Amino acid sequence: GPDFGYVHKEPLFEATASLDSFGNVEVSPPVSVAGKEYPLGRILIGSSFPAPAGRRMTGPVRDFLYAQRVQAPVELYSDWLAVGNLNEFVTFVPTSDKKQFRMLLASPAACYRLFREKQKEGQGEATMFKGKGTARGRSRGQGEAREPGPRGDASPAAWYSGTDTKRVTINKVLSNDVLAQQNQYVQRCIDWNRDILKKELGLLEEDIIDLPALFKLDKQGKAVPYFPNTVTMIVLAKDLGIPKPFGPVAGGECCLERRIRALLEPLGLCCRFLEDVASYHGSLGEVRCGTSVQRRPFAFKWWHCTP
């Protein structure tokens, strides 16, 4: 259509993979880094970096992104994820202050802090996945759903087929040593990217917001979300379409939703939580993976920019 086009690139001699998906290509807001201006932001792509081997974006696509130079790409480490897309751990939201945006990062550490707070408040038996099951099947002779095992199925779809979720509580999560170890590993992966993003986008800690998140490792040792990943949201100006996390419910309210609202709404953002378990989360995606947002073009013309 008018003012809208596309480019088709495909490799001749190598197979494509999930890292070639456009969930693995993001663009930062405009930034200034060490005196250099990036008026159209910088391209972010996920890779196997810093590992010498692993999945990478196919050569022709990667080379195409690097060749345009105006939005000089930043390569991040995303191969630790089962799908491998960087939008599973980082996104940006607009603000009306001088910075004009915040970077959001998925944070297992923030989730564990929140759960420990609730446990100390006497809410350790608050249930997760309220109205959703957490196992492929039910225990023989019982109507209860099982908590996901330490290295269970890769697909979260297998975790939501039951009906009774009373066994998945804050106490249960906090007592799962294997899950804790896995999330310590995930946090280290995210922290590696945090340092890269701070350096390459000129960010300070005050420019970053940590959203509570939990992950599990699949049988290949790759991470998948333990509950719907709120970072993989749709950003529509001040309105955020956030995957409903189905976190522990205490006092009739999900503590994850409450914490996310407390972090984002003071910035003038409106949080709307959308259920996407059946439609996207069960296939290792979230609502953002099945939507396409048409952005308003920058007033600044890219051809006026000197790389």
PLM regions: where:
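Histidine/cysteine-enriched polar flanking segments
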Residues: G1-P307
